């Protein structure tokens, strides 16, 4: 099951903390073996900012075609409203959505991402597994739900 995360800053902090602990960044003796970390899945509802197409050979070798830049939704009263994040996307996934006229800057997306770690203490990679373009009604219903007592309960269970 994916964890629903509403604030990109919290997601970055959660992943960074997990990465630092597993790699013994704080006070490690440097003699620890490299660990292959389990991947994690998250669901985020965000606003599309732009696409950046990959140019480096390393990104292409890893199977990435572009990065989707996303930003927190303002309706969720996030203290980090301007927080942005770059998510890698495969060419297959980009091609499946590129002709959709609703995929424009500012559009709200329901995105499932996988976070995976390389070996040799490389930083985590955020990759889009799938995404859906949300309608205005979907966004309104989502914002009302997460602000409700039932939504708060759901978020607590999802993130425990």
From Swiss-Prot:
GO cellular component terms, A-Z: chromosome, telomeric region; CST complex
Subcellular location: Nucleus; Chromosome, Telomere
Record GO terms (molecular function): single-stranded telomeric DNA binding; transcription elongation factor activity; translation elongation factor binding
Keywords from the UniProt entry: Chromosome, Nucleus, Telomere
GO biological process, alphabetically ordered: negative regulation of telomere maintenance; regulation of telomere maintenance via telomerase; regulation of transcription by RNA polymerase II; telomere capping; telomere maintenance via telomerase
Top-level taxon of origin: Eukaryota
Disulphide bridges, residue numbers: none
Protein name: Telomere length regulation protein TEN1
Species: Saccharomyces cerevisiae (strain ATCC 204508 / S288c) (Baker's yeast)
């Amino acid at each position: 099951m994916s964890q629903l995360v509403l604030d990109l800053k919290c997601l970055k902090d959660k992943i960074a903390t997990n990465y630092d602990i597993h790699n013994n960044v704080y006070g490690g003796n440097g003699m620890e073996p490299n660990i292959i970390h389990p991947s994690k899945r998250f669901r985020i509802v965000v606003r599309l900012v732009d696409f950046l197409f990959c140019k480096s050979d390393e990104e292409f070798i890893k199977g990435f075609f572009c990065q989707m830049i996303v930003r927190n939704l303002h309706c969720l009263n996030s203290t980090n409203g301007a927080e942005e994040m770059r998510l890698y996307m495969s060419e297959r996934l980009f091609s499946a959505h590129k002709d959709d006229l609703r995929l424009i800057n500012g559009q709200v997306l329901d995105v499932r991402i996988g976070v995976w770690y390389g070996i040799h203490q490389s930083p985590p990679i955020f990759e889009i597994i799938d995404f859906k373009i949300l309608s205005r009604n979907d966004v309104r219903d989502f914002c009302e739900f997460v602000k409700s007592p039932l939504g708060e309960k759901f978020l607590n269970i999802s993130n425990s």
